[in-house]
Every structure is written in C-alpha cells, then in structure tokens.
Curated annotation (Swiss-Prot):
This is Small ribosomal subunit protein uS12cz/uS12cy. GO terms for cellular component: chloroplast; ribosome; small ribosomal subunit. With S4 and S5 plays an important role in translational accuracy. Located at the interface of the 30S and 50S subunits. One of its GO terms (biological process) is translation. It comes from the Eukaryota. PANTHER family: 30S RIBOSOMAL PROTEIN S12 FAMILY MEMBER (PTHR11652). Belongs to the universal ribosomal protein uS12 family. The keyword Protein transport does not apply. Part of the 30S ribosomal subunit. GO terms for molecular function: rRNA binding; structural constituent of ribosome. It comes from Triticum aestivum.
Length: 122
C-alpha cells in the first residue's frame, strides 16, 4: 500500500485495455493485399480457407475467408474487418465479401449481408 506522499508524487495509472484488433489501428476496416491463400493446418483444416494479408497499416495478418467458395488468390486486394474465428487460433480478422476483389457468395438467400449478396429481384 503506497503512502499519501508516494501517491502525490506519482498518481495511480488507469489500467489500459489492449485492443483485440491492433492491426486495424482503430479503424473499422482496412485494405490489404493477399500474400497467400491456404487451408489451415491439421486439426483445423476442415473446409475452411484463410489468407495472409498485408495491410495498408503495415501489419501482416491472417484473415478468414467466410462463405462457400471464393475467387481470392495472391495479389488480390481485399477489405478486412475485425472478428475472430472461434476454432482457428490466431485468426482475429475476416475478409469482407462483395467489396474490392472478393466477390459475393453465389446463390445465397438468407444472411446475405455478411456475404455481400444483393437483394434478389422478385
């Protein structure tokens, strides 16, 4: 327990919470270029795809590619948002479908917003 004199000399510092998406530098999204597109190693290899993305903020991150099927390859320009994937350790970002080089998911009827699909014509 510090003395009153010690507290006057240097006040208590508030505990700062660490950001979960440091690579975005406080922005809601960041643009980046795919360095490599691959499947995660065993035991998470299932049918999931991830990409190493070099962001405009200078970070190189691992981002999840949501939805069924994608057109991403090396040098594709993508938009990245925060949001972790529970069963893939170290994957704390997601690629936004339907923007830049990442096309929307085909034949998607429900939950379209997450996958960049426009409202179908009646």
């Amino acid at each position: 327990m510090p003395t009153v004199k010690q507290l006057i000399r240097n006040a208590r510092q508030p505990i700062r919470n660490a950001r979960k998406t440091a690579a975005l530098k406080g922005c809601p999204q960041r643009r980046g270029t795919c360095a490599r597109v691959y499947n995660p190693k065993k035991p998470n290899s299932a049918l999931r795809k991830v990409a190493r993305v070099r962001l405009t903020s200078g970070f190189e991150i691992t981002a999840y590619i949501p939805g069924i099927g994608h057109n991403l390859q090396e040098h594709s320009v993508v938009l990245v948002r925060g949001g972790r994937v529970k069963d893939l350790p170290g994957v704390r970002y997601r690629i936004i479908r339907g923007t830049l080089d990442a096309v929307a998911v085909k034949n998607r009827q429900q939950g379209r917003l997450q996958y960049g699909v426009k409202k179908p014509k009646k």
